[in-house]
Amino acid sequence: MGTVSLGKIAFTYKGSYAGASTYFRQDVVSFNGDSYVCLVDNTVGVAPLNNPTKWQLFAQGTAGVTSAAGELVYNSGGALAALAPGAAGQVLTIGANGLPVWGTPDVRSGTKFKRLLENASTKVNNRPYRRFGGIMTDNSVRMWGNNDNYVLGDGNTFARPYPVRVAFGPGFAGAAKVYVDYNYSGYCIDLNGQLWSWGYNGYGQLGLNDTTDRRVPVNASLIASSSIFGKTVTEVIVAGGVEGYCSVMVLCADGTLHSAGYNGYGQLGLGDTTQRNQFVQVPVVSNVAAARLGRERYTAAYAVQADGKLYSWGYNGDGQLGDGTTTQANIPVQRTGGTLSGKSISNVYCGHTAAYALDNTGRLHAWGTNTTYGNLGCGNFANQFTPVQVAIGVADVYTNSYDYPMVLIRKTDGTLWGAGAGNYSANGNVAGNHAADFAQIPIGNTVTKAAIGGTGSYNYCLALLQNGTVYAWGYNGNGALGVGDSTNRTTPVLVPIALRSVQDIAVYGTSSEQCSAFLFDDGQLCVAGYGGSYANTDNNGNWIGTPYPVIL
């Protein structure tokens, strides 16, 4: 027994209620899980429950309220009540009646990334200048960093240290794919297959039938005189490099190819060198399965048809059209020379002054300028203006966007190989020598993707493995390797991401002003590298040496 004294009032705890016992005022007993205080002396044989003249509830327990494991007890306003356990993944929230209920987690619109800019893919040989972004879980688009020429699409030119929502207008169905070129224009294919464009438009590359810049996205698919009017857009092809004079191509679901913008070297494929301010269908080619553009201004264009035929046109000063000459072509011409003879082509890739074609047997063919760097990987440093076979068992090809050309190839066995410019050992040559032969990068045989960053000799590489880990090597003066410092690496090192899993990687920036992006499988995006114009989202513009979360 115990006595609780509250000044002039003393309660004596008598334990569990017993019907034969005599109780006096201030005696406390437990009964059916609750506690009661006796109100009348000499109370015998009167149970506490429902006898308010003899007993008063002293402290309510949970007996009669809850009986199942995992139930939660709450005050319903007049009594205690039990809430059954929720299901896995549910969270406790407040219902419309003000009482606790189980519900689905309330994820705020756009709080997670689900897809990076298409510049992260091998389809776009381009590295955006001090800016990046992606598509969110609500299908909106967020971007940050340098905002020259309204490229962030938020209506002004202020650099942003945090992701801002691109200001699409009425009729926008949500983003499917987003592209930006080096420093001028942005493009988005919406979920309905319509094309939106914004930014600088001095060459008519926005496809809006004028040369007026756009501060926010405009629907180019609604231009009735445009060749993409009424069509479903599936891909946008932007040029690489840093030279301006912008051209763009658009691939539609029906296999037609369309072009707009600068045309000084016939890169629009329309039979002349006249600029186009709206999209015009490219003649000759049909049922196009893949298309690419080379460098800005001095642009070569390529298309692969579903039947395996390869076409090229445009600038040819470096022999990148693959016809054995350096003469430009203003209209698409099928290429069957050299080792392409009799081959069915499945994909095409291009670099600064060279091109690569993958045939349906996994053989890789290359052509273009090769002196100094050996970027064709053909075993020598001689130019090859007609295609030569350079590798077998190839699954994918990765090139850098401008000078000091190098190339990585991922083979069907999951290994990664490098050739070309050896600056900072990005090509895999530890001594930093240029290499005309492909050499294996020592990171095993589970590579799923690679990327090459930097221009002006500041090359570096990332490689994503099947288990979600990332290796990095090459130039690291601003921490873009994400390994915690600014020391260059001549051999691949593991990026410290603890036990987390990366599902996609990207590189952006030019020269030594580079950044890397790491998209995790939970939708979080982290970046490392250069901080100018808030390229890495750092408010103070400092470089960041380890992957740092992008704060929304």
Describe each region flagged by the PLM.
Residues 105-552:
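Eukaryote-biased RCC1-like beta-propeller repeat architecture
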Residues 26-29, 38, 72-73, 92, ...:
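Extracellular/surface recognition and adhesion modules
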Residues 3, 21-33, 49, 53-107:
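Extracellular repetitive beta-rich solenoid segments
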Residues 31-42, 414, 523:
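Disulfide-stabilized extracellular beta-strand modules
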Residues 40-48, 536-537:
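Short, surface-exposed beta-strand/turn "edge" patches of beta-sheet domains
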Residues 1-17:
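Short, intrinsically disordered N-terminal pre-domain segments
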Residues 26, 45, 68-70, 88-89, ...:
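Glycine-centered loop/turn motifs
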